[in-house]
């Protein structure tokens, strides 16, 4: 027997289509950080809700910001090896 969902998920919308004043620019890493994971991966548009046009622009601007060292490529990697203390 299949269970029915109690509520429908909220409709996702493109933040950039809704707010025309929101700049999509590599110079604004504070906005671009909302669209990458903590590991540095670009979040898919089916999750963020951006339209196809703005997702392409968003991807291009994130890559530009990475080249300009405004955003990280990947998360910092801990090797798991502990450093010896100098006591």
UniProtKB/Swiss-Prot annotation:
SUPFAM superfamilies named among the record's database cross-references: Ribosomal protein S18
Keywords: Ribonucleoprotein, Ribosomal protein, RNA-binding, rRNA-binding
GO cellular component: cytosolic small ribosomal subunit
Transmembrane annotation, as ranges: none
Pfam families found in the cross-reference section: Ribosomal_S18 (PF01084)
GO molecular function: small ribosomal subunit rRNA binding; structural constituent of ribosome
InterPro entries recorded: Ribosomal_bS18 (IPR001648), Ribosomal_bS18_CS (IPR018275), Ribosomal_bS18_sf (IPR036870)
GO biological process: one example: translation
Domain of life: Bacteria
Function: Binds as a heterodimer with protein bS6 to the central domain of the 16S rRNA, where it helps stabilize the platform of the 30S subunit.
PANTHER family with a match to the protein in the record: 30S RIBOSOMAL PROTEIN S18 (PTHR13479), SMALL RIBOSOMAL SUBUNIT PROTEIN BS18M (PTHR13479:SF40)
Protein family: Belongs to the bacterial ribosomal protein bS18 family.
Assembly notes: Part of the 30S ribosomal subunit. Forms a tight heterodimer with protein bS6.
Identification of the protein by name: Small ribosomal subunit protein bS18
Species of provenance: Desulfovibrio desulfuricans (strain ATCC 27774 / DSM 6949 / MB)
Encoding gene per record: rpsR
């Amino acid at each position: 027997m299949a269970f029915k969902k109690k509520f429908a998920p909220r409709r996702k919308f493109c933040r950039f289509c809704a707010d025309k004043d929101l700049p999509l620019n590599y110079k604004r890493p504070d906005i671009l950080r909302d669209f990458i994971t903590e590991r540095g991966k670009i979040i898919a548009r089916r999750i963020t809700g951006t339209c196809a046009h703005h997702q392409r622009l968003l991807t291009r601007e994130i890559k530009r910001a990475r080249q300009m060292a405004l955003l990280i490529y990947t998360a910092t990697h801990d090797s798991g090896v502990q450093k010896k203390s100098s006591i």
